[in-house]
Amino acid sequence: MRNEEKPLVSISNLNVKNLSSKFGLGPEPHVKGVLEVMYKYKSAQKLEENGTQYQWYISDSKDGSYTKLQGIHGKTIILLNDYVGKYLKCEVTAQDTQGNKAKTITSAPTSAVLYTIGNPLTDWFYEARYGLSHHLLKEFIERDFTPKQDQWDANKQTWSQFIDQFDVPKYAKQVNETGAKFVLLTLNQNSGYYITPIAAYDKYMRKAGLLGNEPNPMTSKRDLPLEIINELAKYGIKVMLYHPSNPPHSAHWKDKDFRVTSEVFHYTPGQNGAPGDTARQLVNEFMAELGERYGEKLAGFWFDGFYKEPAAVYNNMDNAYNIADFASAAKKGNPYRIIAYNTGWDKQFHKSTPYSDFSSGEDPNLKAIPSEGRFADDDCQKMLWGVLGSMDNPVHGWGCPGTSKETNFVVNCAKTVTSRGSVLIMDTRVSVFGVLDPLQFAQLLEVKKSLYSK
């Protein structure tokens, strides 16, 4: 072939790699594992790869006819029970930043996907028995129930300066004293203010014309989750992160104008509507960025708001950024990361999506009692999540000071729930200074005694 006929873009050494070799999920592909298509990319013009297209196919036999897996169009694929006994391969069309495409190439088929008993990804979660959660959120900090000294005064401090006050070593020491083996920490809910820097957020803020070269005022310069992850790791305590399934619906640039919600996220101002393509894309990009940054240090994600309207668009596999894409983004950087999607208070112990590793468990009253056994629907670890704080407020006690339950009730709940194979998360207020609510801390010490004393 003459030089002028050489393709501008090409790929070689195409193969499918099993990213999940631990916990009995390899070397053959197993349910709960993650596969990734690998190849060597080459551009004659030295341009970066951008916009490469992927499509996975499935067959009942290795040499049989393959059909397209609807909506499975990412570089990775999470293996589901539906794939057991079947063979997979991936079609790749590489592309550069100018839209030049390589010849489409298809990988060799994998070996048959094998069944996995239960869910070994959640073994650590089950063995932990109980953990804490915190609602460190701007919209909660502004509530009347937050002590005045803990509130943010935007006229005196930037959001970043406010978050800088968190004393991570002091906080980690207290958490360890409670006996909790993991923490679930909020990243953001509806305000659009994050406790960590996010490059993708900056990019889309600038694209919307709301931000120049200055730092994003709605994120902290400090990577608070990473600091907490590293400090808690010294005590053997893991960290998971909370984020809604949708973008923030009440993110204002100023004077409650909803401009960040509408112009950056293209989302429904003031309500949890169905997120459109752009809204889902941004959530995917945010989670993938954070997941890749934290890698195996980040143990899990709990996604809120997977209610009727958002679930409908995510579960439509004809859509871009569907539930398969969302789950793959959440496992970016760690194929063993566990995830859950919350469908509401009335369904604490069920598998809300095919990709759920543990149940959403939400019940602020801590009165939902699981049936015996670890798993819902064979492989979804059961979990109950409720509050310790005062419930005399519009937020049902989440992130609130004081107590709403007698200590004996809390202790008995912990013993009952964990004895049945479920995991328990207790929402505990933490101040911006990294201090746990003293009344709740006292209750947690009693929980520790009941669960771990011989």
Spell out what each predicted region is.
Residues 1-115:
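Ser/Thr/Pro/Gly-rich low-complexity disordered regions
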Residues 115-454:
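Mature catalytic domains of secreted/periplasmic carbohydrate-active enzymes
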